[in-house]
Every structure is written in C-alpha cells, then in structure tokens.
Amino acid sequence: MSKLEAILSQEVEAEIQALLQEAEAKAEAVKREAEEKAKALLQARERALEAQYRAALRRAESAGELLVATARTQARGEVLEEVRRRVREALEALPQKPEWPEVVRKLALEALEALPGAKALVANPEDLPHLEALARERGVELQAEPALRLGVRAVGAEGKTQVENSLLARLDRAWDALSSKVAQALWG
C-alpha cells in the first residue's frame, strides 16, 4: 500500500473514529435525556398515584364515617322508638291501676275547663263510672265511645266544638321535646 493510501486510510479511520465517538456521545446524551425524562415521568406518575391513593383513602374514610354516623343515627332512632313504645305500653296499662279513676277525672276536668259551656263528656264505656259524679256536678251528659281510649272528649252545644284530652294525644304532641330529653339523658 502506498503512503498516500495509508494516509487516506488513517484519515478515514480517524474520521470514522471521530464520527463513532460523536455518535456515541450523542447516543449517550440521548440515553441520559431519555432516562431523565423517564425518571421524571415515573416520579410524576408516582406522585399522581400517591395523590389518587390519598384521595381514595379519604373517600373511603369519609364513606366509613358516614356509614358509622348513619348506623348510630339509626340505632338511636330505634332506641327512641323503643322508649316511645314502652311509654305507650305504660300509658295503656294505666286503666288497670288504682290511680286511673283520678287520672281520667283530671283529664275530664281539663277538657271541661278548656271548653266552657260543654254539654257532654265522651269517654270509653269502661271509664264512664269514674266520671258520673263529675258529670252530675257539672251538669253534662255522659256518652260512651269505645274507640276513645286513655282520655275524654268534651263536646260543646250542637256538637260543633270539641276538646279531646287523651294521654296518647299528649304523648304525640310532646314527643319531640321528650325524645330530645331522652336522647340527651342517654347520649349526652
């Protein structure tokens, strides 16, 4: 090989080596850039997943808290309904108690006071004997109504005006206030 060929061959070889080094450097730079982008993308994705996880965890905790609150509210409602049922049972048992004649008489007095000039007093047939003396004293007629329980009804002239005074109606009217007091006593 001639000297010229050797020089050309060396130059070509040097140029090839330079191109290879440049290509390797560019490839290394591209690789580094790609790795940095991939790392940044991976970190961003990890942060997004972590944020999604925290949000899902907060939603699950909120849902759990809501379920617990709902269960507590439902349980409290059931307890209050049980209290109300027992109070009704106690009221319904009053006619068998020795103090019932005095209770029904007081209910009748309150009804008559609320309706001055009443002409009749209506009560359950079983309660009429307890009200006979009061009816004579007040000059009102006694009338039987089997459906009327735990109370009385004063009836005005011509039957247009009536005042009912029963323990169950009183319980119904007072239940909101009573139930809040019961709840306060039970749960603070």
Curated annotation (Swiss-Prot):
Family: Belongs to the V-ATPase E subunit family.
Keyword tags: ATP synthesis, Hydrogen ion transport, Ion transport, Transport
Keyword Ion transport assigned: yes
Protein known as: V-type ATP synthase subunit E
InterPro entries the record matches: ATPase_E_C (IPR038495), ATPase_V1_Esu (IPR002842)
Keyword Ion transport included in the entry's annotation: yes
Function: Produces ATP from ADP in the presence of a proton gradient across the membrane.
Gene symbol of the encoding locus: atpE
